[in-house]
Regions:
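DEDD superfamily 3′-5′ metal-dependent exonuclease/proofreading module
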Residues: 1-42, 51-338
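Short beta-strand scaffold segments in enzyme catalytic cores
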Residues: 47-49
Length: 338
């Protein structure tokens, strides 16, 4: 097994959309190589993780198939240090593949609090662009290299092989130990992560607040990390719920500030519901009753007046305001109650 570390000064996008959700998080950019698509019969052979905060690219390579367990364990130790990872189709492939191989190879239960698997939060750029942008209509397909070309990134990619060719090269490398084959395999994996790091700028081509409301978004407060999977008006309440990913707490309460509320934090799940006022087609949350104070900066929104925040106007959901309020409610809970 080889663990290769390379210094790299690139950053993810600095756009306001990105910083809204990820500014205070330790983010990694991740890609893996395997011998095939089915984790029941194929193996993890290589993983690359760019630790954005440290400015380091990590690659963990199984030099032989029988080193898979050691390589995967080493790579997961790196990824579990992240608050969030960026992938491309990782919710459908990279993350489930590693989870299934881990269960089979390492035969261990995930630590208490690592709800749902080995990676705390996964931003899948493919899902964002596929469902919440116009690129599906503009481009012939949404393969990573196709989107890279659209974003003007073709000149920054050095490798010229496909994922399938990478597997064929690995078979040759395992038999011969060819240095040339190893370099090509590592370059392909390394370039995928470098390009995906640059591709985070594509969030500006999407309806990102709506995407995050649908796909879920991370919330970090102190040593606690959560994923808000659902947020918005539900009946006569404003509802936010999801998973506790790190340092879970157990709590049941029925008041937030001076407002009636239902708050449940149990094992790896959480839920907060507060009153939703309805007036002339508007869905409104009384911020003063919740005693949010300076915890959030919700007063900056045009539809926030005199302590009342509009989260729905007719049939239109205000996704940015909804997500911001959900983040604020979670932070207020940990500040006042936990």
């Amino acid at each position: 097994m080889k663990h290769i570390i390379e210094e790299w000064g690139e950053k993810v996008t600095g756009s306001a959309l990105w910083n809204f959700y990820f500014r205070d998080l330790n983010v990694g950019v991740l890609d893996i190589e395997t011998t095939g698509l089915n984790p029941s019969s194929n193996k993890f052979i290589l993983g690359c993780l760019f630790d954005v905060k440290e400015g380091r690219l990590h690659q963990v390579l199984a030099e032989r198939r029988d080193e898979e367990g050691a390589a995967l364990g080493n790579f997961l130790e790196l990824t579990e240090k992240m608050d969030a990872v960026v992938t491309y189709n990782g919710r459908h492939f990279d993350i489930p593949f590693m989870e299934k191989r881990r269960k089979k190879l390492l035969k261990e239960e995930y630590p208490q609090g690592d709800a749902g698997g080995c990676i705390p939060y996964n931003l899948d750029m493919y899902q964002v662009l596929n469902s919440y942008s116009q690129l599906r209509r503009i481009l012939p397909d949404l393969k990573q290299k196709t989107v890279e070309n659209y974003m003007g990134l073709w000149e920054t990619r050095a490798d010229e092989i496909s994922g399938r060719e990478s597997v064929e090269l690995y078979n040759h490398y395992e038999k011969t130990g060819s240095r040339e084959a190893e370099e090509k395999i590592l370059l392909h994996n390394n370039d995928d992560v470098r390009q995906l790091t640059r591709l985070t700028e594509a969030v500006t081509k999407s309806d990102f607040h709506r995407a995050m409301n649908s796909l879920g978004f991370p919330v970090k407060e102190g040593g606690h990390l959560l994923e808000a999977a659902k947020a918005g008006p539900v009946g006569d309440t404003f509802h936010v719920s999801g998973r506790q990913l790190r340092n879970p707490v157990n709590y049941i309460g029925f008041r937030l500030g001076s407002a009636p509320a239902e708050i449940r934090f149990q094992q790896d799940e959480f839920m907060i519901e507060v009153p939703l006022l309805k007036h002339r087609g508007l869905g409104i949350v009384d911020l003063e009753q919740l005693e949010i104070g300076e915890q959030g900066d919700l007063e900056r929104y045009p539809l926030c007046r005199e302590g009342f925040l509009v989260v729905r106007e007719g049939m239109e959901l205000k996704y940015r305001e909804i997500n911001d309020l959900a983040i604020t409610l979670i932070k207020v809970f940990f500040d006042k109650e936990a």
